[in-house]
């Protein structure tokens, strides 16, 4: 058994580590709330934009859509956009996206497609660069709260590649934020565009509350979608083709921004869960070490008593 000083030093180290993980958990919990609020604030605009595009598309008919961003063409080259974080200590968040990207890459290559990667986040960049994957572009250092400017920079790069026919389809691999303990990697086609409703009935709201004297995040039901439908007889000043060509790039940027926001919320939720588990494990380890320390101390005291008693008997 380790000596008393070693056990005492380890107990101190574990308790200090627990303070760090608990602080990181609280920070992540507060940021999850802000990330969720950002998604909710952007949803009315995204939903209304999608409804307008659906209205325009229904008027034109899919086969009459003149915008090159909606045209289906023979697919030879596919760009996979993988969204990870710049930091670790968030459970399997980054590893799950990397694994899903590798699976999708192998699947498409097996079907004979030319596949290249656009990587967001240093974790994905480092992993795929070391393994010599074909990389189209990389983006890192994004804000913890994704901005429209960042989404615009990435979407502009994707649009240029798609319009130049350097790629025929763009697929986005990101982490969908379902709830605080459930996030899953999903694959979504970005280009060519096919506007759909933004709202998700699985969405939940998370509130920062206190429980047993500790800060925690609890889920609640999301707000009902009360967004009015676009009237079918609405008159647009421009032609549907002109409106589509003007709004589709904005729609692409908004879809990308929403995915970045969901990924950010998922990363924070994963980090909060990971730090909560780490804090619990540190607490249990400290208890075990304290028990070992008490046993070692008792054994040392018993040994000293036996030595003293033995010495006294020898003298007598």
Swiss-Prot record:
SUPFAM superfamilies recorded: ATP synthase (F1-ATPase), gamma subunit
Keyword Membrane: yes
Entry keyword set: ATP synthesis, CF(1), Hydrogen ion transport, Ion transport, Membrane, Thylakoid, Transport
PROSITE patterns: ATPASE_GAMMA (PS00153)
Subcellular location: Cellular thylakoid membrane
Disulfide bonds: none
Organism superkingdom: Bacteria
UniProt GO cellular component terms: plasma membrane-derived thylakoid membrane; proton-transporting ATP synthase complex
Short name of one Pfam family: ATP-synt
Function: Produces ATP from ADP in the presence of a proton gradient across the membrane. The gamma chain is believed to be important in regulating ATPase activity and the flow of protons through the CF(0) complex.
UniProt subunit comment: F-type ATPases have 2 components, CF(1) - the catalytic core - and CF(0) - the membrane proton channel. CF(1) has five subunits: alpha(3), beta(3), gamma(1), delta(1), epsilon(1). CF(0) has three main subunits: a, b and c.
Family matches, as HAMAP family: ATP_synth_gamma_bact
Xref: PANTHER family: ATP SYNTHASE GAMMA CHAIN, ATP SYNTHASE GAMMA CHAIN, CHLOROPLASTIC
Family, similarity comment: Belongs to the ATPase gamma chain family.
Name by which UniProt lists this protein: ATP synthase gamma chain
Species this chain originates from: Synechococcus sp. (strain CC9605)
Gene: atpG
